[in-house]
Amino acid sequence: MSSNKIINWFRRLREDWNRIITVARKPDRNFFSLNLKVTLLVLAVVGVLAYIIQLALTLIGV
């Protein structure tokens, strides 16, 4: 890649970031709360599944 292509790539990247920042908006309290609850629930489910798998493999002796 030539240096001109790299510079143009960074300029486009910066323009894309600026566009995202101008379009983005702060979520309201209810939407944030729902996202937080769903994220924590999924994290807990994955953690419990990992614990169960680890326990089963330990009991089997693998």
UniProtKB/Swiss-Prot annotation:
Q: Which UniProt keywords apply?
A: Cell membrane, Membrane, Protein transport, Translocation, Transmembrane, Transmembrane helix, Transport
Question: Record's superkingdom?
Answer: Archaea
Transmembrane annotation, as ranges: 40-60
As for subcellular location, the record says: Cell membrane
GO terms under biological process? intracellular protein transmembrane transport; protein secretion; protein targeting
Pull one GO CC term from this UniProt entry. plasma membrane
Concerning InterPro entries, the annotation shows: Prot_translocase_SecE_dom_sf (IPR023391), Translocase_Sec61-g (IPR008158), Translocase_SecE/Sec61-g (IPR001901)
Q: How does it sit in the membrane?
A: Single-pass membrane protein
Q: Which GO terms describe its molecular function?
A: protein transmembrane transporter activity
Q: Does the keyword Membrane apply?
A: yes
Give the multimer and partner information: Component of the Sec protein translocase complex. Heterotrimer consisting of SecY (alpha), SecG (beta) and SecE (gamma) subunits. The heterotrimers can form oligomers, although 1 heterotrimer is thought to be able to translocate proteins. Interacts with the ribosome. May interact with SecDF, and other proteins may be involved.
Q: What role does this protein play?
A: Essential subunit of the Sec protein translocation channel SecYEG. Clamps together the 2 halves of SecY. May contact the channel plug during translocation.
Family the UniProt entry places it in = Belongs to the SecE/SEC61-gamma family.
Under what name is this protein listed?
Protein translocase subunit SecE
Q: Which gene specifies this protein's sequence?
A: secE
